[in-house]
């Protein structure tokens, strides 16, 4: 139903956000956090 779709959308957004943060910290480890 609609509620399940909303939960899926939110989960997708959260997953994207978490993946982005993980990617950033990974980059940070590799490059030595140079901005």
Curated annotation (Swiss-Prot):
Q: Which spans are transmembrane here?
A: none
Q: What tissues harbor this protein? A: Expressed by the skin glands.
Per UniProt, the keywords (alphabetical) are: Amphibian defense peptide, Antibiotic, Antimicrobial, Disulfide bond, Fungicide, Secreted
Compartments, record wording: Secreted
Query: What pairs make up the disulfide bonds?
Result: 28-33
Presence of the UniProt keyword Disulfide bond in the record: yes
Kindly indicate whether the keyword Secreted belongs to this entry.
Answer: yes
What residue stretch is flagged as signal peptide?
none
List the GO biological process terms.
defense response to fungus; defense response to Gram-negative bacterium; killing of cells of another organism
For this record, the Gene Ontology CC terms, alphabetical, are:
extracellular region
Organism superkingdom: Eukaryota
By sequence similarity, the record places it as follows: Belongs to the frog skin active peptide (FSAP) family. Ranatuerin subfamily.
Describe its function.
Antibacterial activity against Gram-positive bacterium S.aureus. Shows no detectable hemolytic activity towards human erythrocytes.
Q: What is this protein called?
A: Ranatuerin-2SPa
- What species does this protein belong to? Lithobates septentrionalis
